[in-house]
Amino acid sequence: MTAPKLLTDAQMQHFIAHGYLRLRTELPDSFHRGVYQQFDTLIGTDAALNPGNNLLPAVPELNQVFADPIVRGALTSVVGPDYVMHPHRALHNNPPGSDAQRIHKDSYWGYLRRVRNHRSRWAMIMYVPQATPLERGPTGVIPGSQYQSQRPDDALMPEVAGCLETGGFLLIHYDIWHRKMKNFTEDKRFMMKFEFIRMQEPDSPSWDHSDPAWRLDEPPALNLSAVWRRQWNWLRGAPNQDVPVNDIDAAGLASSNPHQRLAAINDIARCTEAARAHRPALAALLRDPLEPIAVDAAYAMASAGPDAMPSLLDVIQGDTEEDLDPDRGSHDGSRPDPGMPARSAAYGLAEIGLPAVPGLLDILSNGAGSRARKLAAFALGEIAGTGTEGIEALCRAKQDPSAAVRINAIEALGLKPASPAAVAALSRAVKDPDPQARFSAALSLAQIGPGAEAAIPALKDALYDENRYVPGYAVEALERIATPGAIRALLPFLKTARWCPHTSPASIY
């Protein structure tokens, strides 16, 4: 197999800031024409034939797309070398004259149940087998919007059409705001969407890296460099640098112009002393009505280190609301989001790291509202080296009455080193009454991998769960555990779940 063609520093910085890249496979046009014909046969005239999550066995040629060196290199670069494919797959048709979709984010946990990742943990590939110019209804994305949960302001963050040539694909951050655009032509437009998950925390760059400096040439409409620089350093496994900054326009923090507020925040974020000096003003910006400013301010506060912790912890502790989110699908972000200040604070505390752990543990155990406890669980998961105390607290949180808290605690355990306590807690969580908690537990066990051998009996049962994603993650977990016992548990399920791509209504045997 040809070696993956990794992204460059410039491409990675574009992805971090903009949230997407346009790339093209190396496969010939004849391959893409064949895929187009198969897609047309499946859903070109009858959406009822859409194979949904069975797309890959229905069109096994698509495995060549994911074996392509450009695709493998892009995914290796943004989600690490041992990424896995999510069990959800989607084939989308944009027929002639089809209306545009609403701008949305995808979700399996409900719109606000799970805290959205800023770090590059999930990515999507949107592949098209035909040329997709603007008039044919490409995917539209809002550059830089992966760092906000509320729908972006159109005037501040304009949409970009992800136009692609034949065999092209969009690589997007899972949490970017996007939509299907209107097809003005008489031609069909097909797009398939696959999702990929990081399985290991980065300790070094996984792309073609040569220059540690942040040198983004063309930023998106809103400059969140306080956020971007930290994502860059996290992906490199590198510490954040303290850079003395002269002539900071601190008055810009109070400007009515959002670009001036961001410019001041970004300058302050580069310098520890400046962040300490302007901490009260930054803390006030956590409640800015524009979410990008609140988020950028939280990252700038992280530059102040432990000095910023009381302000950030107080914002989370002061959120006493219950985290009720019955919406299980995508949402257009139009409803009010009172949890924005506390969520922004959680991102800042995650960046501060280990000094924030005691305060977060207290909120996780004693927070008056489930939203605060959820945010504490999330931030603890993002912080490396929380130790036995952190793992034990997250294990206890698996018993929280709020499904949102349990889901975030379960996910956090998957980001920690393997431990008997975590594996036991996750094995029990695979039987949680909430389906999202169950599939999050199976994914966390997959991330732990060989250290989760004790979970084999629970994972064997999970293969037959009524929720379609629990078995998908259980398969990944058993494969990654890879002991003879894990393989013996896995093979009978795979044999009965086998799909024959050669069988159709026209040829049933």
Where does each model-flagged region fall?
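Amphipathic alpha-helical scaffolding segments comprising HEAT/armadillo-like alpha-solenoid repeats
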Residues: 242-254, 273-287, 306-331, 354-365, ...
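Non-heme Fe(II)-dependent double-stranded beta-helix
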Residues: 1-114
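Catalytic core of non-heme Fe(II) oxygenases with the double-stranded beta-helix
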Residues: 99-163
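Non-heme Fe(II)/2-oxoglutarate
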Residues: 181-251, 258-275
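Short inter-helical turns and helix N-cap capping residues of alpha-solenoid HEAT/ARM repeat scaffolds
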Residues: 256-257, 289-290, 319-321, 337-338, ...
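Conserved metal-binding segment of the jelly-roll/cupin
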Residues: 164-178
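Structural detector for internal amphipathic alpha-helices that build alpha-solenoid repeat scaffolds
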Residues: 222-242, 259-274, 284, 292-307, ...
